[in-house]
Structure formats: C-alpha cells, structure tokens
Curated annotation (Swiss-Prot):
Region of interest (Interaction with APOA2), residue spans: 122-173
Documented effect of changing S53A: 13% loss of phosphorylation by PKA and 19% loss of phosphorylation by PKC in vitro
Motif interval(s): Nuclear localization signal: 5-13, 38-43, 58-64, 66-71
Protein's organism: Hepatitis C virus (isolate HCV-KF) (HCV)
Residue numbers marked as site, Cleavage: F177, L178, A191, Y192, G383, A384
Region called HVR2, residue ranges: 474-479
Presence of the UniProt keyword NAD in the record: no
Impact upon substituting S53D: No effect on HBV suppression
Phenotype for S99D: Complete loss of HBV suppression
One Gene Ontology term of the molecular function aspect: structural molecule activity
InterPro entries: HCV_Core_C, HCV_core_chain_A, HCV_core_N, HCV_Env, HCV_NS1
Cystines in this chain: C453-C460, C487-C495, C504-C509
Protein name: Genome polyprotein
Length: 520
C-alpha cells in the first residue's frame, strides 16, 4: 500500500488554498511542503503520553514551553559578574604576572582559575602556582604537589562558600568596601599592654606606639583596651578616654574633626555604592592603608599606668576595667551599641550629611549590614558630651529613671490634742522640691510647695554670662557667693589626695584589673 497522499484535483475551490499538512504512520509529516522527521527524546513543556489508566481522566492544561528570561537592568557589578572598565581582565593579567612560571600550565576542567573572577583570579593564581612549584621539587614533588593542589581546591571551595553565603543572605550582601569600613572600626588587640623595663615586662594600661592609629589636634585614635599616656613639658599625663578607641587631652575637646573624617569616608562609600564600583573603591582603600604615613604629633610613653575608666571608685568602674581587659573588642562593641541612640541625635543635630546620606541609601537598598557598620563607625567617634565611656551607660540609665522620681512628699494632717490643733509635719520647701523629677513634677504639682524657688534661682547665672569656646576643664572656686548647689553651673570642690593609712577599708591597686592589696 502506497503511503503517498492522494493527489487532489485542482478546482476553483482549492487552487488558492493553503496546502494541508499530511502525517505518515511512521511519525513523519509534511508541513508547508517540507518533510519533517520524528522528534526524538522528550519535548520540553509538553506532557508525555498518558498511561492507559489515565486516559479516562480529563486531560489537564498543557504547560507552555519555558523560555529563557532576558536579563533586566545592568549586568555588571552584580554578585558573580566581572567588574567594569576592564577590572576583571586587569586583575587576570595581574595574577598572570604575579604567578611563577610553573603555574602557566592549565589543570584541565577542574582548574580553580576557571571559576574565579576579580580578586579571586589573583588568589587562585597564587595558590595554583604554589602547587605547581611544589610539584617540581625532586623526590618529594609528587606528595607535596598533590597536597598543594588539594589546598588550592580547598581555597576555591571556601571562596565559593563565602560568595554564596554573602550573596544570598537578605540585607547582608558583602563587598570589599564593607570590609574597608570594618577595618576603620577596630584593630584586633591583645588583652594586655606590656612595657619593657630593664628586661622585665610589666602589664600596663598605657598604649604602646604600635597601638596608636591616628593623631589629630588634641585627640588620639588607638586600639581598644588601653589609654594613651602623653609626655608634655617633661611630665607624663593620662589622656581622657572619650570612647574605647578615642582619647583626648581633656574632656572638653570637641570631636568635630574626627567626625568630619567619618562624614567624608561614609559619603565616599555611598557614592561608590551608587556607582556600583564599591569593590573597586574598597580595594583601592585597603591598598592605600599599606602606604599611608601619618606624622606623629605627640610622644606616647608607658610610665603612667592609666586607668581605663577615670572617675570615682565604684563597682561600675571596676567591672568596666575588667571587661576592657578581658575582651577589648567585646567591650568596644557593647560600648558602641549603647551609644547608638545618642549618636543618632548627634548626627542629625550636627548636620553630618555624609553619614545621613549613607544610612538613607543603604536602608533603601535593604543593605542592613552596612547600615549597622555605619552606625557603629559614627558611634565610635561620637564624643560630643563630656561623660567618659565608662560612665555614659550608667549616667543614661540614671537620667532616665530620674524623670520619674517622685521626690520627697508628705501629707499634711491636722491633729486635735486636748482641744488644740497641731500640724504633724512641716510643709515641703523649695530645697526638697529640687529632688523631684521633671515628669513627676508635672503630674504631681499639687503635692509639693514651690514657695521660695524664684528667690533661690535668682542667684543662678544664664549661659550668656560665661565665656564661650573650649579648653581645659578648670575648677571654679566654690567660695564665691554666686555658687549654689542647685544651679546648673555649680562646680564641686576638687578631689584631694589622702594617704592610704588614713583610709578605713580595702585599698585598691588599679592595675589592668583592680586588685585589693590590703585592708586598713
């Protein structure tokens, strides 16, 4: 039996009509005058032939053949994409030039350099080159070469794991510029600073020269866990620790200069991120740190044995000293996290537009890791108030609870004794009213007597009566008639020094961790 289709007779009805498709028993067919062979293999997007048990069921809707989605937007500066402006090719050539001659041969399809991009080209080229050089050593080249190749593959696996983890966590996309910002926050510090005296090492809180990171006018940025001891005019003196990494000559020195540096740094980071070249800017920044030279302004010595937290003797001071020496980095993170609320107010009031722009941009793109890094970076140099780092947290808590202090209050009652009336208590005066919190005074104004307060406050001077500016903190003479304890400008008497033999109780020796040396 012939399989050729039956020829049709040409009539007026079917002369101009489109030729019909013809199917053959073998699976072939003629479509538009072209013979098509049977398609072998499964067809994408179309359900296969149903089983006999399924033919009684209604046929479901066929799925369309999937089509490859065209990439939308930019394809560069994304995780896994090469850098623009020939950055990927340039780093590839840099790795080729840095690699030894033995690393030029390829390792085949499992070569780690096939999957590397950007800075990964340099890392993988060096590890593979080292493995090839180990393989050329006589006698032991085979085992050393195999171990070195396994090490190179392990490094590549770590790079792939880091790229996958940091590229798929929401809000935590990692970049080299993020590591550059983190390098400004803290430098890994040892738990103790030591000084060498005639071959004998003593544990001290004084910063060594290697712990000094940056020096400005009246300020020193250093690693956490120490306090600078500066020699000036043939005398050594401990500087005041404003933050765990920032010390000043005195507590009144403004930190505007350091905060402007942070403004410029965060503004540059935001601009680089907006231009999608953050990794390139971060690489330039990290490399520039290797060649940065800052002249020394001050002579730092280690003969002061400063306390990390200056102030009166308290349990909070001893606990803070112990924490700073136990883990300087942990103390730094805790201190900066607690300073974030005050830092937010300072960055708005101080018009730090670079930091505000960075926070706004990173928040809009959902990069919360960089938002936290910028907040910690600004909190690390935010020393606008005169409270030292150890007392800031305690003072903030005391200031919050003082708003709800009820103050001394009493109920006035009349008592009839033997026909005469007596008042059991005297009324509250203005001196006791000073101890009432602000919010409590608003809600309980009817419970205390404010008589005499205007007369008391008349002796206090407004702020325009004082000299403006900043400088060393001096003690006001409390014997002046204008000084009153309830005035805002009242200064207490300076602390004196008494011999330990006159102290009744334990005597503390403030080494890096306070130690009780005896009891008098």
């Amino acid at each position: 039996m012939s399989t050729n289709p039956k020829p049709q007779r040409k009539t007026k009805r079917n002369t101009n009509r489109r030729p019909q498709d013809v199917k053959f028993p073998g699976g072939g067919q003629i479509v538009g005058g072209v013979y098509l062979l049977t398609r072998r293999g499964p067809r994408l997007g179309v359900r296969a032939t149903r089983k006999t048990s399924e033919r009684s069921q209604p046929r479901g809707r066929r799925q369309p053949i999937p089509k490859a989605r065209r990439p939308e937007g930019r394809a560069w500066a994304q995780p896994g994409y090469p850098w623009p402006l020939y950055g990927n090719e340039g780093l590839g050539w840099a790795g080729w030039l840095l690699s030894p001659r033995g690393s030029r041969p390829s390792w085949g399809p499992t070569d780690p350099r096939r999957r590397s991009r950007n800075l990964g080209k340099v890392i993988d080229t060096l590890t593979c080159g080292f493995a090839d050089l180990m393989g050329y050593i006589p006698l032991v080249g085979a085992p050393l070469g195999g171990a070195s190749r396994a090490l190179a593959h392990g490094v590549r696996v770590l790079e792939d794991g880091v790229n996958y983890a940091t590229g798929n966590l929401p809000g935590c996309s990692f970049s080299i510029f993020l590591s550059a910002l983190m390098s400004c926050l803290t430098t890994p510090a040892s738990a103790y600073e030591v000084r060498n005296v005639s071959g004998i090492y003593h544990v001290t809180n004084d910063c060594s020269n290697s712990s000094i990171a940056y020096e400005a006018a009246g300020m020193i940025m250093h690693t956490p866990g120490c306090v600078p001891c500066v020699r000036e005019n043939n005398s050594s003196r401990c500087w005041v620790a404003l933050t765990p990494t920032l010390a000043a000559r005195n507590a009144s020195v403004p930190t505007t200069t350091i905060r402007r540096h942070v403004d410029l740094l965060v503004g540059a980071a935001t601009l680089c991120s907006a231009m999608y070249v953050g990794d390139l800017c971060g690489s330039v920044f990290l490399v520039s740190q290797l060649f940065t030279f800052s002249p020394r302004r001050y002579e730092t010595v280690q003969d002061c044995n400063c306390s990390i937290y200056p102030g009166h003797v308290s349990g909070h001071r001893m606990a803070w000293d112990m924490m700073m020496n136990w883990s300087p980095t942990a103390a730094l993170v805790v201190s900066q996290l607690l300073r974030i609320p005050q830092a937010v107010v300072d960055m708005v009031a101080g018009a730090h537009w670079g930091v505000l722009a960075g926070l706004a941009y990173y928040s809009m793109v959902g990069n919360w890791a960089k938002v936290l890094i910028v907040m910690l970076l600004f909190a690390g140099v935010d020393g606008a108030n005169t409270h030292t780092v150890g007392g800031t947290e305690g003072f903030a808590t005391q200031r919050l609870t003082s708003l709800f202090a009820l103050g001394p209050s009493q109920k006035i009652q009349l008592i009839n004794t033997n026909g005469s009336w007596h008042i059991n208590r005297t009324a509250l005066n203005c001196n006791d009213s000073f101890k009432t919190g602000f919010l409590a005074a608003l809600f309980y104004v009817h419970k205390f007597n404010a008589s005499g307060c205007p007369e008391h406050m008349a002796s206090c001077r407004p702020i325009d009566k004082f000299d403006q500016g900043w400088g060393p903190v001096t003690y006001a003479e409390p014997s002046i008639s204008e000084q009153r304890p309830y005035c805002w400008h009242y200064a207490p008497r300076p602390c004196g020094t008494i011999p330990a033999s006159e102290v009744c109780g334990p005597v503390y020796c403030f080494t890096p961790s306070p130690v009780v040396v005896g009891t008098t």
